[in-house]
Regions:
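Catalytic cores of carbohydrate-active enzymes across secretory and cytosolic contexts
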Residues: 1-285
Length: 285
């Protein structure tokens, strides 16, 4: 059995079949599968999917991604689909299912409970002078929608002044691909945005945005989640998003925080009771 992960190796089954490889080969896509309209904009979209069909099993994060893929198979390739997920197209047979990745929930609960005695978490709680701590934890990546997130928080302070001094946004965003120019630009823009918001609304004893371009240990992050009132998870696109799951698992059962979740994260399919928002709509966020 060969198990292949993510789009970087999407063509590998086709190459292995050329080498007479007869083992079962499975493929799991961690990112969202594009809509038919976007996929067909690629000149070689048929060749791409043809290579994908050389896998015996194709896995996606959500049922929605499976349905989008099957729509392409039927409408563009004239393929057929069986009730068990088997597909027939381009003279090949494969099978498609969704396998949402997750977390070790019991482990996260245990870790978060232990943070009640964490010195670092106590320091955070002591330093927060507001009623509502909002926490965001993301890689510094364009897909996470951090610029729009800061814009939404600025919109909140501008149009709902009662939240000035009553909220604090703690955004943790460790560097991702720091040597790439585009990622350096994201960091520069975020630092500029945070500076403008803090300059406009901050005071000597209150900083609206605490933006930290560094990582923290998992135990510390779970403690930050546990002591916040809002978890802000607003990616522009995300296959699943495990931060959303960690946020929920880390909460106190007696007094949980609220998860604000992008409709474009795969996790939204599993958490309909979260506050589902469009990250492009600052008023909605």
């Amino acid at each position: 059995l060969i198990w292949v992960h993510d789009y970087h190796f999407l063509l590998i089954a086709k190459e292995l079949r050329k080498l007479k490889c007869t083992q079962k080969i499975g493929f799991f896509l961690h990112i969202p599968w594009p809509s038919k309209e976007i996929l067909t904009a690629l000149p070689d979209h048929r060749e791409l999917v043809d290579a994908l069909l050389d896998f015996d099993l194709i896995g996606f994060q959500t049922r929605k991604h499976v349905l989008i893929f099957l729509d392409y198979i039927i409408s563009e390739l004239g393929g057929s689909v069986e009730p068990d997920g088997s597909i027939f197209a381009l003279g090949k047979k494969s099978k498609v299912k969704h396998f949402p990745i997750s977390i070790d929930t019991n482990k996260i609960i245990k870790i978060s409970e232990e943070t009640d005695n964490s010195t670092q978490v106590k320091r955070l709680v002591k330093s927060i002078k507001t009623d509502k701590l909002i926490v965001g934890v993301d890689r510094l990546d364009y897909s996470k929608g951090l610029e729009l997130r800061f814009s939404a928080y600025n919109h909140l302070l501008t149009n709902h002044s009662e939240h000035i001094r009553s909220t604090t946004l703690l955004q943790i965003a460790p560097t991702s691909r720091g040597s790439v120019f585009q990622y350096k630009e994201i960091r520069r823009k975020l630092e500029l945005s945070a500076g403008k918001i803090n300059s406009a609304y901050g005071d000597f004893d209150w900083t609206p945005i605490r933006y930290l371009n560094k990582g923290f240990q998992q135990k510390s992050l779970m403690g930050f989640f546990r002591n916040s009132r809002i978890g802000l998870v607003t990616p522009l696109r995300d296959g699943m998003n495990l931060v959303a799951k960690e946020y929920i698992a880390s909460q106190r059962v007696s007094d949980p925080g609220v998860l604000i979740l992008s409709r474009f994260a795969g996790a939204a399919e599993e958490f309909p009771d979260a506050l589902i928002v469009n990250p492009h709509d600052p008023e909605g966020v």
